[in-house]
Curated annotation (Swiss-Prot):
GO cellular component: cytosolic small ribosomal subunit
Name of the molecule in the record: Ribosome hibernation promoting factor
Entry GO MF terms: ribosomal small subunit binding
Similarity-based family: Belongs to the HPF/YfiA ribosome-associated protein family. Short HPF subfamily.
GO biological process: negative regulation of translational elongation
Record field: transmembrane: none
Induction notes from the record: Induced during stationary growth phase.
Keyword field contains Secreted: no
Pfam families for this protein: Ribosomal_S30AE
PANTHER family in the cross-refs: 30S RIBOSOMAL PROTEIN (PTHR33231:SF1)
Function, as annotated: During stationary phase, promotes and stabilizes dimerization of 70S ribosomes by the ribosome modulation factor (RMF), leading to the formation of inactive 100S ribosomes.
UniProt entry tagged with the keyword Chloroplast: no
Length: 95
């Protein structure tokens, strides 16, 4: 899985990069064929926003989450992506 992290109005520190890498590695337990991941971390005034686009076999998955801090936004994003990946995997099994 290739992981690309971009920051808008936020500095991507080594700790933040490591947190994102660890969290996204856990997504492979839901769907093992994740090819590329694009993560955009943004700060707009007081809102922290994390967006992600996953390129997987059989399609593309996108999710976005907001939080009081960047770590909370990333946790929310991972929860949304885990649900979507589970749904995507079930959809592929049915066909």
């Amino acid at each position: 899985m290739q992981l690309n992290i971009t920051g808008h109005n936020v500095e991507i520190t080594e700790a933040l990069r490591e947190f994102v890498t660890t969290k996204f590695a856990k997504l492979e337990q839901y769907f093992e064929r994740i090819n590329q991941v694009y993560v955009v971390l943004k700060v707009e005034k007081v809102t922290h926003i994390s967006d992600a686009t996953l390129h997987v076999n059989g399609g593309e998955i996108h999710a976005s989450a907001e939080g009081q801090d960047m770590y909370a936004a990333i946790d929310g994003l991972i929860d949304k992506l885990a649900r979507q990946l589970t749904r995507h995997k079930d959809k592929l099994k049915q066909h």
